[in-house]
UniProtKB/Swiss-Prot annotation:
The gene is glpK. Activated by phosphorylation and inhibited by fructose 1,6-bisphosphate (FBP). Belongs to the FGGY kinase family. It catalyses: glycerol + ATP = sn-glycerol 3-phosphate + ADP + H(+). Its EC number is 2.7.1.30. This is Glycerol kinase. Glycerol binds at R82, E83, Y134, D244, Q245. GO terms for biological process: glycerol catabolic process; glycerol metabolic process; glycerol-3-phosphate metabolic process.
Length: 496
């Protein structure tokens, strides 16, 4: 009987179960969206039990629709929206509050207090991260400070904390395993990425009892088995876990030092594998753990662009320039250039390397001759310019020359964007045959742990190229265009 790996891709707006075969090919995808809660401006929450319900639903759909029996699943891998925080009662299994999502800014005041107390350097030195509401630690503190009775329960050892991977493993194992992996732990603001353990000083700063925290395990590891009543009477190994961006790096087979992937989703997330050394950034990048596997931990540099695919959605829904996001390519290629127009899509501030939350979106270079085509092209070009900002920072910090950029995510189907990306970077861009690299990464991690795949070299051989975009632009034109972008960003930042 043929065996498969099931990957659970628990994202910000939907949960998906993707079944992969031994060749790393997709056999079936099941997806279910769930509700977003916005209780106050800037707050984003999920119901953790609704997420759990969506997981059970997609597992059932994936197996029934594909005709695969539960006993044919050799292992389960989990990849998840990172930083999103769940706190639950360890006796009842009931969350004490909604899951606070990575995007949510409700712990901004806590972050401000930590900065005012001078903790920035300590936190940066130990975690590789910035003090920002984005990360889990201040979200946990917010729950303990604002939910009645929560702090007392936590001090008594009755509450558990977890990122989404921890919550799902706990639920799937029937409460037997309270664990996380190195990649998810490294996003909490509480984990020392050098000592590889929860840091007592950081826990003290945040006021989080150690008893709440999950045990940290490798990213490729059998954590527990599913309880039979959650998996059609079968005990299946839960064998891999990684945060979504780290899973994508693994799914792209970026196993060697200096290999880089960029995911074009709502925003862009670029990660560079830096091997067994954690590089401290001088250019606004985060230092993070890529994964723990084969008895060692490997690190990555990470850069975040806040607005990428959402800029294309803005053209479609806000400005009504087209009805389908795919049409953006058709309009962009009609214009020979952006004709001096620059769009700075800083709708929620700018991420790496600027970290400027006060700047807002701006458009420069408009003339009477500017057309819809110019505007659409300029918006797409902005995604490529922002990616160059991040890659340049990575090259500066690492001292590693980048030979190629591997790409994934929804926007990579846009050939114009990928072409321009290669041109402006002066680096070839490689688009893989399988675009579901996040789910594939967690499947690989689980498959390695249960012996479904033998080693990373077998996985590396499975990576297949769909298209390679070679840079063709002259150096002079590249410099001129990018200088214009930098001027536009500076002007937008001056307008506050």
């Amino acid at each position: 009987m043929e065996k498969y790996i099931l990957s659970l891709d628990q994202g910000t707006t939907s949960t998906r179960a993707i079944v992969f075969n031994k060749a790393g090919e997709i056999v079936h995808i099941a997806q279910k969206e769930f509700r977003q809660y916005f209780p106050n401006p800037g707050w984003v929450e999920h119901n953790a039990n609704e997420i759990w319900g969506s997981v059970l639903s997609v597992i059932a759909s994936a197996l029934s629709e594909s005709g695969i029996e539960a006993g044919q699943i050799a292992g389960i891998g989990i990849t998840n929206q990172r930083e999103t925080t769940v706190v639950w009662d360890k006796h009842t299994g009931k969350p004490v509050y909604n899951a606070i999502v990575w995007q949510s800014r409700q712990s901004a005041e806590i972050c401000q207090e930590l900065k005012e107390k001078g903790y920035e350097e300590t936190i940066r030195e130990k975690t590789g991260l910035l003090i920002d509401p984005y990360f889990s630690g201040t979200k946990v503190k917010w729950i303990l400070d604002h939910v009645e009775g929560a702090r007392e329960k936590a001090e008594n050892g009755d509450l558990l904390f977890g990122t989404i991977d921890s919550w799902l493993i706990w639920k799937m194992s029937g409460g037997k395993a309270h664990v996380t992996d190195y990649s998810n732990a490294s996003r909490t603001l509480m984990f020392n990425i050098y000592d590889l353990k929860w840091d007592d000083e950081l826990l003290d700063i945040l006021g989080v009892p150690k008893s709440m925290l999950p045990e940290v395990k490798p990213s490729s590891h059998v954590y527990a088995e599913t309880v039979d009543y959650h998996f059609f009477g079968k005990n299946i190994p839960i064998a891999g876990a990684a945060g979504d961006q780290q899973a994508a790096l693994f799914g792209q087979a970026c196993f060697e030092e200096g290999m880089v992937k960029n995911t074009y989703g709502t925003g862009c997330f670029m990660l560079m594998n830096t091997g067994e050394k954690a590089i401290k950034s001088e250019h606004g990048l985060l230092t993070t753990i890529a994964w723990g596997i084969d008895g060692k931990v490997e690190y990555a540099l990470e850069g975040s662009v806040f607005v990428a695919g959402s800029a294309i959605q803005w053209l479609r829904d806000g400005l009504r320039m087209f009805k389908d996001a795919k049409e953006s390519e058709k309009y962009a290629v009609r214009a020979e250039s952006a004709d001096g127009v620059y769009v700075v899509p800083a709708f929620v501030g700018l991420g790496t390397p600027y970290w400027d939350s006060d700047v807002r979106g701006a458009v420069f270079g408009l003339t009477r001759g500017t057309t819809k085509e110019h505007f659409i092209r300029a918006t797409l070009e902005a995604l490529a310019y922002q990616t160059k900002d991040v890659l340049d920072a990575m090259k500066e910090d690492s001292g590693i020359p980048v030979k190629t950029l591997r790409v994934d995510g929804g926007a990579v189907k846009n050939n114009f964007l990928m072409d321009f990306q290669g041109d402006i970077l002066d680096v070839p861009v490689e688009r893989p045959e399988i675009n579901e690299t996040t789910a594939l990464g967690s499947a690989y991690l689980a498959g390695l742990a249960v012996g479904f795949w033998s080693d990373r070299s077998e996985i590396k051989d499975q990576w297949q190229l769909d298209k390679r975009f070679e840079p063709k632009m002259e150096e002079k034109e590249r410099e001129s265009l990018y200088n214009g972008w930098k001027k536009a960003v500076n002007a937008a930042r001056a307008f506050k």
